[in-house]
């Protein structure tokens, strides 16, 4: 192992030294008189400045232009640009490397000292340093053909806000409205003056006014004046209106007059659109507080009841306007949505707005095709294909009916351990209704920007494990999905029924399948809650939480008083499963800079079978290993506990457990542009049984479960094409829980030069999407 590591380290060092040597010679490609701009250094000389490091960082980041990017000290993109040379044609490899991979040199002539002095002055004043002294110089080295900039800054004292005044003396109703929310100001006494805070406070005021009828107001009509007349480091801030620049409409509060929904809008160029949208042969159908305009009744008027958030007579509200648009979008029935607001006055001079929502229906019917292929390390390949048909408005209320036919196979083309080929075919139907069916039974919050939905699902799947068993499953579900807010989602399925029928073949004795066989009915509710802070916008730290509660047979068990010592109770002639299952998936994402990310996940899950069941149905149990689990172990062949197939003469098809604990950490960093990322990861965890199984010794969960933790690590690539993420991971075991005490950690046995070691330990995972 040491020899292979030394060779690998030596080759890596040699390649890096060669790249650095080449990078240092980039200036030889410059024309006579040209220099390469290497960047600028900013030094804040005020020793008393508490924010010295912060100032140097933000000021250095403000200087323009930016020098050529460096990766571990090497201007890699500039080197590739120079290596490629001048393209001889508009196509070809040379052109691609130069334009797509490479980066043109940033020349010294593009660096303007005086312009950057002004940039730094503005940046300092925007952060409360109103009277700085900036000394700059430029260093041109004609011999090395390089240019550098140097800025020495005496920031001076920083000014803090003493008093904040909101339009005192202004007697207009608009000014009074602004003063009403002065207590919610983002500008606080004693805080340093920050232009960003002033701009944010203007936006806060604008948002409030737009939600109280002031349709024509703009934050640009507000100006913050600063008085630095005192000899102290305190200033007074006066928020004022630019009254002389504001049109009369700005001071008026508008109310809603009428609301119209046009479901036949044609989105074209301006000229064509006007002609296409003339309201010929259209009916205007009044319904409650709005009217629907359409040629024929493609959509029932009641559809828009939960979407339209304002009523005639209400003060105009930007928030409710956006909420209406978002709810119309979430109906998933329209490909184009546009709102128009027209101002008018009533006979008394009251300012009014007429709202028109123009909707272009999406094609009502659509076909979809999906295909996928995969390869696994245990010499297995597979493929899946599905064909779907969707109707987006099956009952004229934006109800969506989707029917999907799918099929696939998985087979072995080699390898020491032979497993049977698998075949699957299935039919699924899904009806989605944009409202809560029987909604009066549930008290849920549906005031978010997303229309709550009800789902009715019906499906059948047939699985054939060649020479071992065949499996038939029928499922029916009735449930609800709604969003409490943009980052909180609930899924409640009070009715979930799955019927499972498994038949084994006579020659199935080659494999032990009792641990994956279940015959009977799974009946009970499920509830899932998801929180995702990433949806709300970019933050340095984001959180994700997904919790699931899955119950089966509990009400039936209470009614029938089930007892494990007796034969299982039946319903419709079939035994039913009785269990409680809970699982949580918690993730933390920490960003460094603009693109680097540290992703972490903790998964905890447990299922307990009781009453009418001795063990959990296999389709509800947990497994470990694979592309989204412990990536250094093969999928479904890790655990339970310290058990391993090498310790048993039994031939297992897969290994499952009742408890799962797993922790993952992964650091992602761009390798090229934004679409190619590299990753280094470590995974740890395992699965366990709650009840002893003599065929899997060591598989039961005990107080010493830590001894059974498996650990793997590796490297990966992520090809992020926005709409698709292709992931390649190479993992290997670092700790094998089935090994003898003192030998479980296998890091010191790593031997990349050994073919047999690589075949046994390197696991290649090809997958779609990030693992977490």
Task: Cite the ranges covered by each PLM segment.
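Interaction-mediating elements
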Residues: 2, 25-330, 339, 446
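Bacterial N-terminal signal peptides that target proteins for export
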Residues: 2-11
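C-terminal motif of bacterial Sec signal peptides marking the signal peptidase cleavage site
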Residues: 20-23
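Strand-connecting loop/turn motifs
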Residues: 129, 214, 232, 364, ...
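C-terminal outer-membrane beta-barrel translocator/porin domains of Gram-negative envelope proteins
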Residues: 277, 374-378, 491-671, 675, ...
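Gram-negative/organellar outer-membrane beta-barrel architecture
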Residues: 297-298, 317-546, 631-632, 638, ...
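One-face residue pattern on beta-strands with alternating periodicity enriched for small/polar residues
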Residues: 384-390, 426-430, 457, 477, ...
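C-terminal beta-signal and adjacent terminal beta-strands/loops
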Residues: 684-700, 723, 731-753
